């Protein structure tokens, strides 16, 4: 029997007689990790790696007297592989070490044993080499790849990681989940069973009176770290020490990895549907496929069945949603809806053609009232036009072509009927485009293109009041941009040609019509720069005047039906365009000049734009005679004046404003003003005022802000997706107020509470779904961080409605095993 004071050991199946206090031997083979050690060279002069058995002729004394040579590694491996054989080297440390070679080693006082990614600390450790078994007593702590266990007694076989731990506390690396048990049985290094145990993601503190805000208590837990799943048997979920849910068997995630099983139920209270309970079940079909089945009970309507299927491949992806409500008790009929989206490419099988692009967007519902009764299911409270749209496209080099079919379902409201758009059954498009290309020996620099469109427009003539038609449209254009740092000039010529074949005669008796319209435009601009200083800051100030002239002769189009044209909105994006209309049924006559000027203040170091101010106005040299059906021609020689400003002087503040001013009436026709204050994460307030004279006037306010600021608690900046610390309340919401009607149009108001390991949310949502009707619902959710969510889910509602809303918790990467390194 030999004893040694506090010193490191490397254990070996071969005993070496030693007389020094530092004992070194090897067990197994060299560990291919962060370091490499060598024992002194034998008589032949070659070195023997640490962990390899020396030749029989190597003098034992020489091996013991010469220090080990360690070679450092630049990084520690995140995954620690086993060495050759099934063992790595085993290291032991302690105040006192005793034992028998090849049989057992006993470490007393500050005992420690390490192998690979496993470390064991205790008051006493007994290591039995033949069985590779460890017994530990007193203040035992084991860390296996970042998962930690603490308790009074541990017995484990290291090579199989099989054994038990009595009365341990544990903490898992992947999500911070922790708890305690009467006993833990280790099945292997990836599987264990905890008996009469608890589980929570609340961070434990050192107070003896500490209790988690929530915990799951169970007769037993089965933890699978390969699948990153836990299973609780005979479980009760307790919140604030009050039992709220019981489960005979319940599985839950140990990370964000997907798994099949029941998802948390959602609860909704709605003035339209009553109280709703929905229980989703998730199917993890494959890494690139999944599905969700979501049955629900609505107290006012009945049983609703919903489902979703998603797939993702290298060249395509898609999503299918379906919903059926048999025997709706409020409408006395079956209700249903479906939606399908697909996008990707397919191989045509012909090398000359190559791949084809395929895009599908199909949606349909059972009746006209669906959008009003189920605004969430139909994805939009104003979704009254549902498309069944399918497109096959192809492109190669400068050429592109597509075939499309588009059919609409129009959901009518008797109090606010709409004219349905035309179906396109089918539509063929093609275009050929060249940029910076040569032309007729004139050299390069020309941009030219030819595009064609053939469409069959179809709709109910009793609703549209005009015949259906086959329309062929062609547009050719040629331009030559001259560009320089000081400015640009771009002359352009266009030719529009259109022909129609009608299924019923026009008012003049014609069953066909044609139209050819040329257009010439000249776009030009200059750019001046200077260094300037404002309010103590240095900027590069620009002055960018622009002039745009367009000339299109008049062609009578008053008898032509309108299938897809509409008036362009008058704004900075459209004021410098040739046609006053979108679509191809109306080409506006024009003899006008648009003048504008923009000035910007740019940060000379970053190029960031601090201020932008712009003005634009059209000067008309002749009346615009081409109009949409029922509209009046434009005779004003001077258009409304557009004035816009954008200010981002400091990152926290932003300001945007656009005004359309009528110089004749000296009144604003349209105006919008928006301001946002965003000093940091989870602090944002935005407000906007929008007015269109004699039509609408609205005030829009949105916010997310910590209420704790009111009493001086500023919290901590933990970064986006991590909140600002526990015990904090956040106000969230958005209000849209109609000034003429003196009422709220839409409203979302809520409060979130961050309790560190749990988050509570209460959100009130009011949605206008008709001229005189609205839907009000209350969304309540309890989120047990890293575990589950219970109740209605308001997160997507908040994200899509509250400007710059941030989640209090977002997915983060699994921590490194060195986070809990011992």
Curated annotation (Swiss-Prot):
Residue segments, region Disordered: 38-97
Family: Belongs to the LptD family.
Major location (coarse): membrane
One Pfam family in the UniProt entry: LptD
Gene designation per UniProt: lptD
Function, in words: Together with LptE, is involved in the assembly of lipopolysaccharide (LPS) at the surface of the outer membrane.
Keywords: Cell outer membrane, Membrane, Signal
Subunit structure: Component of the lipopolysaccharide transport and assembly complex. Interacts with LptE and LptA.
One GO biological process term: lipopolysaccharide transport
Signal peptide annotation: 1-37
HAMAP family: LPS_assembly_LptD (MF_01411)
Coiled coil: none
GO cellular component, one term: cell outer membrane
Name of the protein in question: LPS-assembly protein LptD
Domain of life, per lineage: Bacteria
Subcellular location: Cell outer membrane
């Amino acid at each position: 029997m030999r004893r040694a004071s506090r010193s490191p050991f490397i254990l070996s199946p071969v005993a070496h007689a030693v007389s020094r206090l530092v004992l070194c031997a090897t067990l197994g083979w060299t560990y291919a990790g962060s370091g490499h050690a060598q024992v002194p060279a034998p008589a032949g002069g070659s070195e023997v790696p640490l962990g390899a058995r020396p030749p029989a002729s190597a003098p034992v004394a020489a091996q013991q007297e010469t220090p080990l040579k360690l070679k450092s590694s630049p990084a520690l491996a995140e995954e620690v592989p086993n060495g050759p054989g099934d063992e790595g080297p085993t290291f032991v440390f302690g105040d006192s070490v005793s034992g028998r070679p090849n049989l057992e080693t006993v470490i007393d006082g500050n005992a420690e044993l390490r192998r690979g990614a496993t470390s064991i600390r205790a008051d006493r450790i007994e290591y039995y080499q033949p069985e590779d078994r460890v017994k530990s007593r007193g203040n035992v702590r084991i860390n296996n790849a970042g998962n930690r266990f603490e308790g009074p007694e541990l017995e484990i076989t290291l090579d199989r990681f099989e054994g038990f731990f009595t009365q341990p506390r544990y903490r898992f690396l992947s999500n911070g989940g922790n708890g305690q048990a009467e006993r833990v049985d280790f099945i292997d290094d990836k599987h264990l069973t905890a008996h009469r145990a608890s589980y929570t993601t609340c961070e434990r503190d050192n107070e003896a009176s500490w209790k988690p805000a929530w915990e799951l208590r169970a007769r037993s837990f089965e933890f699978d770290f390969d699948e990153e799943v836990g299973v609780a048997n005979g479980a009760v979920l307790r919140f604030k020490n009050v039992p709220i849910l019981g489960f005979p068997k319940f599985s839950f995630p140990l990370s964000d990895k997907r798994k099949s099983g029941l998802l948390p139920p959602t609860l909704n209270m709605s003035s339209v549907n009553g109280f709703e309970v929905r229980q989703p079940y998730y199917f993890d079909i494959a890494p690139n496929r999944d599905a969700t089945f979501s049955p629900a009970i609505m107290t006012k309507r009945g049983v609703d069945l919903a489902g979703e299927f998603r797939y993702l491949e290298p060249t395509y992806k898609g999503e299918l949603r379906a919903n059926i409500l048999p025997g709706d008790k409020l409408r006395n009929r079956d209700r249903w809806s479906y939606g399908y989206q697909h996008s990707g490419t397919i191989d045509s099988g012909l090398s000359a053609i190559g791949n084809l692009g395929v895009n599908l967007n199909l949606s349909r519902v059972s009746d006209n009232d669906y959008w009003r009764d189920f605004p969430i299911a139909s994805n939009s409270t104003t979704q009254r036009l549902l498309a069944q749209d399918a497109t096959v496209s192809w492109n190669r080099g400068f050429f592109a072509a597509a075939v499309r079919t588009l059919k609409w379902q129009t959901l009518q409201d008797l109090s606010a009927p709409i004219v349905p758009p035309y179906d396109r059954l089918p539509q063929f498009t093609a275009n050929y485009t060249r940029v910076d290309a040569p032309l007729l020996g004139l050299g390069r620099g020309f941009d030219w293109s030819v595009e064609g469109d053939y469409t069959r427009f179809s709709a109910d003539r009793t609703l549209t009041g005009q015949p259906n038609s086959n329309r062929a449209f062609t547009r050719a254009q040629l331009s030559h941009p001259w560009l320089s740092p000081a400015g640009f000039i771009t002359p352009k010529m266009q030719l529009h040609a259109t022909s129609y074949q009608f299924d019923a005669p026009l008012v003049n008796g014609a069953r066909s019509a044609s139209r050819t319209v040329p257009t010439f435009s000249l776009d030009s601009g200059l750019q001046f720069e200077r260094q300037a200083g404002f309010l103590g800051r240095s900027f590069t100030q620009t002055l960018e005047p622009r002039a745009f002239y367009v000339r299109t002769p008049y062609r009578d189009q008053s008898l032509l039906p309108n299938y897809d044209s509409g008036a362009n909105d008058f704004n900075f994006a459209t004021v410098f365009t040739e046609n006053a209309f979108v679509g191809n049924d109306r080409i506006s006559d024009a003899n006008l000049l648009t003048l504008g000027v923009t000035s910007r203040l740019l940060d000379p170091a970053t190029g960031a734009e601090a201020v932008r101010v712009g003005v634009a106005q059209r000067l008309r040299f002749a009346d615009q005679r081409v109009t949409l059906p029922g509209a009046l021609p434009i005779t004003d020689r001077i258009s409304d004046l557009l004035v816009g400003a954008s200010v981002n002087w400091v990152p926290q503040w932003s300001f945007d404003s656009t005004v359309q001013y009528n110089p004749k009436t000296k009144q604003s026709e349209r105006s919008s003003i928006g301001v946002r204050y965003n000093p940091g994460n989870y602090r944002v307030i935005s407000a906007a005022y929008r007015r269109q004279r004699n039509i609408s006037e609205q005030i829009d306010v949105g916010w997310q802000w910590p209420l704790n600021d009111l009493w001086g608690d500023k919290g901590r900046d933990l970064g986006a997706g991590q909140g600002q610390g526990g015990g904090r309340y956040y106000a969230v919401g958005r209000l849209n107020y109609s000034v003429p009607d003196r009422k709220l149009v839409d409203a979302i108001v809520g409060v979130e509470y961050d309790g560190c390991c749990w988050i509570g949310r209460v959100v009130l949502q009011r949605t206008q779904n008709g001229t005189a009707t609205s839907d009000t619902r209350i969304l309540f959710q309890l989120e047990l961080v890293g575990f589950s969510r219970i109740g209605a889910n308001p997160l997507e509602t908040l994200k899509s409605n509250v400007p710059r809303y941030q989640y209090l918790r977002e997915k983060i990467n699994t921590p490194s095993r060195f986070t809990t390194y011992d």
